């Protein structure tokens, strides 16, 4: 995942690189070899984050200390002071008390709302799932909201049962209850959808698909669908067609007819799943 924060043009750029955990060190080593061979005007600055920093901070401050984190203050400072940041891979573990994902923190702290996920066939790379070798899909995944907003409850406060009548059937006989809020905002929908259309306009692409489940999840996905259709009208003058469809149908059609897709915009969770699927059509996540 790349986090680009490019400022005004200058002779040399300061770039923070973060290897993360485990395989991330191998990935970053290879990436730096390639980038340094290009003789780019870059001053490199190393920073750390991920599970390794969680363990290190626990040893330093003690388990349960609020200062324990996957993203240390010096890493945040490095990102703020440099022009761009590249990051490899990190480890996130479930069920660890006090643990906060480094990726989610970075996305929310710096408001990195666009997760741009391309999937394009490359010469010499086999793609057994797709009959048509000419796949060129760019997915705009909203990156800060939805179920990944990290608004969760466990154990569930009793007053939560009174918020919605749909909770009545969970009051008794269900055992423990956990809830994750699916948070959508008008601003969040508007800016990711407009970014997708602006990209299509700038690159000469003629379709933008919005993948949702507004037929079932009527409030959150209903909001995204409504805003998408409103914005789509603005781009008809540029010959760009906005197409909205159910996300589960998209999952099927990506396998059957991937060449029908050019630009896709989706909410955080659907975009996460569909972009991984699309990447496999072109050889795997390593090629996306």
Which ranges hold each PLM region?
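N-terminal glycine-rich phosphate/adenylate-binding segment common to multiple enzyme folds
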Residues: 55-168, 179, 269-271
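Short acidic loop-to-helix transition motifs that present clustered carboxylates
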Residues: 50-52, 123-124, 245-252
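A short beta-strand-loop structural module common to alpha/beta enzyme folds
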Residues: 41-53
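Glycine-rich phosphate-binding loop
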Residues: 74-94, 239-288
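Glycine-rich phosphate/diphosphate-binding loop of Rossmann-like nucleotide-binding domains
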Residues: 16-38, 161-246
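Generic N-terminal amphipathic, Lys/Arg-enriched alpha-helix
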Residues: 8-20, 47
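Buried hydrophobic positions in well-ordered alpha/beta secondary-structure cores of metabolic enzymes
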Residues: 21-24, 83, 140, 196, ...
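Short coil/turn connectors at secondary-structure junctions
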Residues: 10-14, 40, 81-84, 111-112, ...
């Amino acid at each position: 995942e790349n986090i680009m924060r490019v400022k005004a043009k200058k002779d040399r750029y300061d770039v923070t690189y973060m290897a993360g955990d485990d395989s991330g060190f191998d990935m970053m080593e290879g990436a730096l070899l390639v980038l340094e061979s290009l003789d780019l005007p870059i001053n490199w600055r190393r920073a750390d984050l991920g599970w390794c920093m969680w363990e290190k901070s626990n040893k330093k401050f003690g388990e349960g200390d609020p200062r324990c984190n996957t993203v240390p203050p010096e890493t945040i400072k490095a990102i703020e002071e440099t022009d761009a940041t590249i990051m490899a891979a990190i480890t996130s573990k479930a069920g660890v008390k006090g643990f906060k994902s480094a990726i989610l923190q970075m996305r929310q702290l710096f408001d990195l709302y666009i997760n741009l996920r391309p999937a394009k066939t490359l010469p010499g790379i086999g793609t057994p799932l797709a009959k048509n070798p000419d796949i060129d899909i760019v997915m705009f995944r909203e990156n800060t909201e939805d179920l990944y907003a990290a608004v969760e409850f466990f154990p569930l406060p009793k007053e939560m049962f009174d918020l919605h009548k749909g909770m009545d059937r969970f009051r008794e006989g269900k055992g423990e209850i956990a809830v994750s809020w699916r948070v959508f905002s008008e601003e969040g929908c508007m800016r990711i959808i407009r970014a997708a259309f602006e990209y299509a306009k700038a690159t000469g692409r003629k379709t933008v698909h919005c993948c949702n489940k507004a037929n079932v999840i009527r409030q959150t996905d209903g909001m995204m669908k409504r805003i998408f259709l409103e914005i789509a009208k603005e781009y008809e003058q540029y010959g760009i067609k906005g197409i909205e469809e159910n996300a589960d149908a998209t999952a099927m059609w990506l396998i059957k007819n991937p060449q029908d897709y050019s630009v896709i915009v989706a909410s955080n969770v659907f975009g996460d799943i569909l972009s991984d699927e699309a990447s496999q059509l072109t050889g795997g996540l390593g090629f996306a």
